[in-house]
Each structure stands twice: as C-alpha cells, then as structure tokens.
C-alpha cells in the first residue's frame, strides 16, 4: 500500500498523486487499485478478470493498451515532471518521433499506459515495490507489461531491498522496444 504516490506533486498541489493498494501472492501482483483523489478516477484489476477504469464515480469501463499499426508515426511516452528530460531523451532512438507526456505519480503514468493513452512509461530512478505492484496487475490485465530496463519481469518480496530496478511500462509489446529505447542485450 502507498497512501500517497507522488508526494512531491501533492506538496506542489499539482493534483498528480494517487493512493495505491496491491495484493501480491507468490511474488506476483494479483490485485491492484489506483485512486486519483483529485480527478476522482479509479483504476483496478484482478488477475484473470481484466483491467477497469471508473471515471469520477461513473460506470466501470474495461481498458486495454494501445496496439500500433507499423510503421507507427509517433510513440507517446509518459515521463516524470521531476526527472531530467535529457536522461530520458538520451535513451530514445532518433529513428522514431515521440510525444513526451509529463505527469507526477508513477502509478498514474502506468495507468495511462494501461488505458492506451500513452504507449510507454520509462522510469529511470528509485521507486519501491509498493509503487509498481498494483499497476503491474492493472497493466498486465490491460495487455501490457512492466519490465526492468534489462527486459526481465519485476518480482516482489524476493530481493534484499524493496527498491525496484529502473523499469519500463509497455503498452504494445510487439513494438521494437530494443530499438526505440536503445536497450542493449
């Protein structure tokens, strides 16, 4: 549980913060809920049951990631408002066009991938397992993936530390992410 994901955004009064709850079984998230109190939007998923969005007390809407027709004209990438943009752009191949979408909360950025509003969220910097467990369930149930930047799945309660490695949230796994994000094998 993370009662305040996006603490700096909360302090700055940007509205880009969330409350996160996850259930992890056998080192893998099986349930996730993300609530944005300012927008009133809730995202949730349960393993095998799909991913859903409740926009401001309305009816639940099933969500899914965006799939591209190749060649794609542009890749939308959610980025942190607080991160050095050059650190991100150095990782991007010049062969593609990008729309960078700044946002605060890590959970809300991952949920944008889950609902197909952006294609990717690249996180280079410290986060805890509590920042990704709920959104991993939501993203996976929506058809996406959350992987380390070495392209291995994130795991929970298996390391000596609860800190995550750098990671990427991918909507369309069929895109050539090794090329797009200049990932070295």
Question: Where are the model-predicted features located?
Answer:
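Oxyanion/phosphate-interacting regions
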Residues: 90-94, 109-185
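Short helix-loop capping/hinge motifs at secondary-structure junctions, enriched
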Residues: 50-53, 58-60, 174-179
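Short secondary-structure boundary/capping segments
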Residues: 34, 66-69, 92, 158-160
